[in-house]
Regions:
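Glycine-rich, acidic/polar active-site loops that bind/position phosphate-bearing ligands
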Residues: 1-217
């Protein structure tokens, strides 16, 4: 920043910087680390010769239909190829309710690294769309009459655990160690701590209550 006073101050509109600071402060205060796994839905749409959207998806709107999923195999395999080269441990994928709507997931991790991967994933999809002459659409609802795209965000608080490099079968890493780093081990404090195996533990219940209280934010 170029201010005369405190030019090295945090930019308050920096979303990533805010997330990093809050996560570090929380861990320092409570000793827990926030783990996050996201489930990004998006649509692969067709376009006209002039590049404008046709308003149609590449596949038909059949949820969890293997044929619709396979029709996009060349596309999502290219996404996997690029993602793996950039440190993504891809773990699952499926076709959702809307036309051309896929959800491709990677391993959960530290909240900041997952946020970085989520942002990078959108860029990967955009590049793959260019190569296949289609549109990678992350709009929530690009047209009416179909299910919208969302992004489930699975949160948990962990104690312990260590950062470990996952080479993802690369003989030598094609990028920095940090890009291929994931938290391994530790204890999920949301797990049941009573005889009820379906009821989250005390910390989990408090976290759920806190999230519900502040949903409006």
């Amino acid at each position: 920043r170029e201010e005369r006073e405190n030019p090295g101050a945090q930019l308050t509109s920096d979303c990533r910087g805010n997330l990093r600071i809050h996560a570090q402060e929380f861990k320092k205060k409570h000793g827990d680390q926030l783990g996050v796994g996201t489930e990004p839905e998006m649509m692969w749409l067709t376009k006209n010769e002039d590049g404008t959207p046709t308003g149609k998806g590449f596949s038909k709107p059949y949820c969890y239909h293997i044929d619709q999923f396979e029709s996009l195999r060349p596309v999502f395999m290219k996404v996997f190829e690029y993602a793996r080269a950039m440190g993504f441990d891809m773990i699952q994928g499926d076709h959702e309710d809307a036309p051309g709507q896929l959800e491709l997931n990677w391993m959960y991790d530290d909240v900041l690294r997952n946020a970085d991967r989520l942002s990078t994933y959108r860029q990967i999809c955009a590049q793959v769309a260019r190569e296949f002459n289609i549109i990678a659409c992350f709009m929530t609802k690009p047209f009416m009459g179909v299910s919208a795209s969302g992004c489930h965000t699975n949160m948990s608080l962990w104690t312990g655990g260590k950062d470990k490099i996952n080479k993802l079968h690369h003989k030598s890493l094609p990028g920095m160690d940090e890009v291929f780093t994931y938290v391994e081990g530790g204890t999920n404090t949301f797990m049941p701590d009573t005889k009820d195996v379906q009821l989250p533990g005390k910390i989990g219940l408090k976290a759920i209550g806190g999230v519900m209280k502040h949903l409006g934010a």
